């Protein structure tokens, strides 16, 4: 159990516009945009045509705001990119709206390629134009789809078009990219789509959130991850078809899903600072998808889907792309059993209960009761087996005294005794081992469930965070600077449970073993999600009731041997009846 704790402890036509709600920079009229070369047939060289890329850099930009029921997005005409995205129904630990795009000064999305003259083209440096009459603020109706196209023209035949599609009740944003007549300006056979933005911190416990942060790429059924828990910079490169790339923090993610074949991807992470607790600490991730572009093609058109929102299981599962694989549900060697338990048992049951019960603390209590009922046959058999083993101690001592110098005879006599009593020496351990995958799955389940985030119960303000009932003026190693109420009660009930089960030593120095495991859990659980501590508290209380009313934990030696003699008599009577 201590090894398990060591490895598992953590140390979401366009509608008629309404009045704008915030100021945006003054729109740039088409006349103010830089002039582009008039035609490919004017005799200009590719080198002259590329001057338009440079002239576009210094032009002013225009910003637009798109509002849906779930989020507010800010886009810029410079680069036709997303500048900010703020969720409406989620808050950070200090009450501010959660921003999933907030630290990208140049925008989060761009196209890039190498020209035939060895120049790097980045669309975030280009000024795109909008359709005439496009307002500064756009609102998406409940059942509408808003399409917002941006166009950059080198001349009448060569252009870049980037179009976004927004819906009101979904965190998905459609993206369509079209390049026309640019084949003479693109070297090689590929272009890159780059997502260049981290996901900012949103939780009070920055250390735990930093452990969950990372960038991911999924290809051929294999998940590649970049985490900055050891190195300041890490990079991974993939080739061939890539199903998706993503970056996440504890509860939120930005995912880029290509709708067309790819030729590879790169995920890069950079860490600023050393300790997540420091205010200046930050993690920045860059995702790059490589797209094929045949040099003989007059036009390139690609479609993508962006998911920028909470990591709710059913929203991610709807894509059928194994997006939930980036959620850590336990150690890899147990993933084959822990992940199905979580995704197909715990999450469906927990979600079902949450539809009918308004408070998630009550959901956790009822969930604990259901799990306890499901495990009752295993735990009852375990406790009864241990009780029988304790009652057999006099018989075992007598066998050892009868054959002091013959271990083989001892073993034969002990096996015969076990067979007569109906006891398996592993009967006390095996049911507990069978429960281990369930316990591991629950250990990771509660910290990863966004439904309980910032939901309170009793004195706990947030079931996804520790429930401090006393803040200490100092920090204790391995424990922290506070006392968690549910954890304290959990440890006390575990001591009572141990004493009732009769499994602990009660004489001399060995009596301390009754308290060692509860003390260690009290230390380890002090900084975990209070929802997890609440679950184990209720589970311990149910175990106490189980031991009191439903399980034999004390079996008298004489009573047990009388049961054995009774079994022998019944077997003898059956043999006589057969004769």
Model-derived features with residue positions:
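Helix-loop-helix
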Residues: 1-25, 75, 175-180, 194-212, ...
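Juxtamembrane extramembrane loops of integral membrane proteins
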Residues: 8-94, 100-104, 150, 568-579
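Generic detector of short, locally flexible boundary/turn motifs and exposed helical patches
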Residues: 36-43, 48-52, 138-144, 156, ...
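Soluble non-transmembrane domains of integral membrane proteins
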Residues: 58-327
């Amino acid at each position: 159990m201590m090894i398990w704790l060591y490895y598992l402890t953590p140390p979401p036509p366009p509608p008629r516009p309404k009045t704008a709600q915030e100021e945006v920079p003054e729109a740039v009229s088409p006349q103010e945009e830089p002039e582009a070369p008039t035609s490919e047939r004017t005799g200009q060289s590719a080198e002259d045509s590329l001057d338009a890329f440079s002239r576009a850099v210094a032009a002013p930009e225009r910003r637009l705001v798109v509002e849906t029921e779930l989020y507010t997005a800010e886009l810029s005409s410079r680069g036709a990119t997303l500048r900010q995205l703020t969720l409406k129904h989620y808050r950070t630990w200090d009450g501010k709206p959660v921003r999933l795009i907030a630290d990208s000064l140049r925008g989060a999305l761009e196209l890039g390629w190498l020209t035939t003259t060895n120049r790097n083209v980045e669309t975030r440096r280009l000024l795109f134009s909008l359709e005439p009459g496009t307002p500064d603020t756009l609102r998406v109706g409940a059942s509408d789809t808003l399409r917002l196209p941006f166009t950059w023209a080198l001349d009448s035949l060569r252009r870049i078009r980037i179009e976004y599609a927004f819906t009101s009740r979904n965190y998905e944003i459609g993206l369509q990219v079209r390049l026309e007549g640019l084949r003479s300006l693109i070297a090689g056979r590929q272009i890159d789509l780059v997502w260049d933005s981290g996901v900012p911190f949103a939780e009070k416990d920055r250390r735990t959130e930093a452990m969950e942060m990372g960038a991911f790429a999924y290809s051929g059924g294999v998940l590649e991850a970049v985490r900055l828990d050891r190195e300041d910079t890490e990079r991974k490169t993939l080739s061939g078809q890539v199903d998706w790339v993503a970056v996440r923090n504890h509860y939120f993610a930005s995912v880029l899903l290509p709708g067309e074949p790819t030729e590879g991807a790169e995920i890069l992470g950079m860490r600023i600072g050393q300790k997540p607790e420091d205010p200046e600490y930050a993690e920045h991730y860059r995702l790059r998808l490589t797209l094929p572009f045949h040099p003989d093609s007059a036009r390139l058109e690609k479609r993508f889907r962006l998911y920028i929102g909470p990591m709710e299981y059913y929203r991610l599962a709807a894509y059928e792309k194994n997006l939930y694989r980036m959620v850590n549900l336990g150690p890899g060697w147990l993933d084959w059993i822990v992940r199905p338990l979580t995704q197909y048992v715990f999450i469906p049951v927990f979600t079902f209960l949450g539809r009918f019960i308004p408070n998630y603390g009550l959901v956790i209590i009822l969930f604990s009761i259901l799990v306890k009922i499901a495990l009752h046959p295993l735990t009852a058999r375990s406790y009864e087996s241990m009780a029988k083993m304790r009652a057999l101690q006099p018989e075992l001592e007598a066998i050892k005294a009868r054959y002091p110098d013959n271990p083989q005879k001892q073993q034969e006599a002990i096996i015969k005794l076990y067979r007569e009593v109906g006891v398996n020496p592993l009967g006390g351990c095996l049911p507990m081992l069978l429960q281990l995958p369930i316990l591991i799955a629950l250990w990771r389940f509660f910290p990863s469930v966004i439904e309980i985030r910032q939901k309170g119960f009793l004195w706990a303000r947030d079931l996804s965070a520790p429930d401090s009932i006393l803040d200490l003026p100092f920090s204790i190693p391995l424990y922290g600077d506070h006392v968690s109420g549910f954890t304290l009660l959990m440890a006390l009930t575990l001591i009572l449970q141990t004493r009732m089960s009769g499994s602990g030593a009660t004489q001399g120095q060995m009596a301390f073993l009754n308290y060692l495991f509860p003390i260690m859990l009290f230390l380890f659980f002090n900084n975990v999600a209070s929802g997890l501590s609440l679950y184990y508290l209720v589970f311990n209380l149910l175990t106490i009731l189980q031991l009191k009313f439903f399980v034999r934990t004390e079996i008298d030696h004489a009573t047990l041997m009388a049961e054995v003699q009774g079994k022998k008599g019944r077997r003898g009577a059956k043999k006589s009846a057969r004769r």
